[in-house]
From Swiss-Prot:
Alphabetical GO biological process terms: aerobic respiration; mitochondrial fission
The UniProt record lists the keyword Mitochondrion: yes
Residue ranges, compositional bias (Basic and acidic residues): 9-30
One GO cellular component term: mitochondrial outer membrane
Protein name: Mitochondrial fission regulator 1-like-A
Length: 319
């Protein structure tokens, strides 16, 4: 009987209340069989709930083992340089901390101490490894400076064109002054009403244009320059123009070679320079359309045409 009572105790714990306790209350007497079939789980009164018992059962049956840890073995022949706290190769956080300043030949990371130059004697292997793993900013600056050469050549060509236009205007003024003085002072020129009417009209109009084009030339400079002959000045300007064109062609060839060899050029700067050149061309074309008669080339040709048309053929032969 004792063994039967002991066997009945787990059933009580598993299924809950005893039959005697169920029949003591009047409600238990009314529904006696229903109370008998009620199941109360074992983990109802435990604070951890049902998940803990399930996980424990699953974990006890599964062969779970911890992961193996990596073990490092120190070689006896290695130097003490490899056992320092600083890493050999810079990490991603050290990319901005590039020590290519002060003309140093090695790259350092943030964790490195900054030694004195006379004390720091790195091995060639360390220098090669650091320089190959970390980019050098100075090389990039030199490349960018080389890539800016086309823009510099374009600015230089625009400055040369401006100087050439100033020289043309000066020569036109000198030739006009020489032609007017020679034609008025010579006795071989027939005095006509049309000539007298045409030359005074041409003088003030030309002075107004030259005063607008050339504003920084004084009267003393004009007197000094007027001593030279017009033919020598024209020849010198032609030779100067040819030399400028050859220099511009060389600059263009250099810029083309640079643009072909360096495909990653700074295209924004080159495009800005080209845009400036286009604006200068448009401005010059607009001025030529508006002031076509004020062009120095037209003035020179007109003065020479009047000079040789007004003079006698005998004077032309003598000249």
């Amino acid at each position: 009987m004792a063994s039967l009572g002991a066997a009945a105790e787990p059933e009580r714990n598993l299924f809950g209340k005893d039959e005697a306790e169920a029949y003591e209350s009047p409600e238990g007497r009314r529904s006696g069989r229903k109370k008998r079939t009620k199941i109360v789980p074992v983990w109802e009164n435990k604070p951890c709930g049902s998940s803990r018992s399930l996980v424990r059962r699953i974990g006890s049956h599964l062969p779970l083992k911890p992961c193996t840890r990596a073990c490092f073995e120190a070689l006896p022949s290695a130097s003490n340089l490899y056992f320092t706290d600083t890493p050999m190769v810079p990490t991603l956080a050290d990319i901005k901390w590039i020590a290519a300043d002060d003309d140093e030949t090695y790259a350092r990371v943030r964790s490195d101490t900054r030694p004195l130059k006379h004390k720091w004697r790195p091995s060639p292997l360390l220098v090669m490894q650091r320089n190959s793993s970390v980019p050098n900013l100075k090389m990039k600056e030199e490349k960018m400076f080389c890539l800016k050469k086309p823009g510099l050549s374009l600015n230089r060509s625009s400055d040369i064109q401006e100087e050439l236009s100033i020289l043309r205007s000066q020569i036109a003024r000198i030739v006009a002054g020489d032609s007017v003085s020679s034609c008025l002072g010579s006795d071989s020129i027939p005095v006509n009403v049309d000539l007298e009417a045409s030359l005074p009209d041409y003088g003030p109009s030309y002075q107004s244009t030259t005063s607008f084009v050339i504003s920084d030339i004084t009267e003393e400079d004009e007197l000094d320059v007027s001593e030279y002959s017009s033919a020598s000045l024209v020849d010198s300007t032609i030779s100067l123009q040819r030399q400028i064109e050859t220099n511009m062609s060389d600059d263009d060839e250099d810029s083309m070679c640079l643009s072909k060899s360096n495909s990653f050029a700074d295209m924004m700067g080159i495009l800005k320079d080209i845009h400036k050149m286009k604006l200068n061309r448009d401005w010059s074309n607009r001025n030529q359309c508006l002031h076509k008669e004020e062009d120095p080339v037209n003035l020179i040709s007109e003065v020479l045409r009047q000079k040789f048309a007004l003079c006698d053929p005998d004077n032309v032969n003598n000249e």
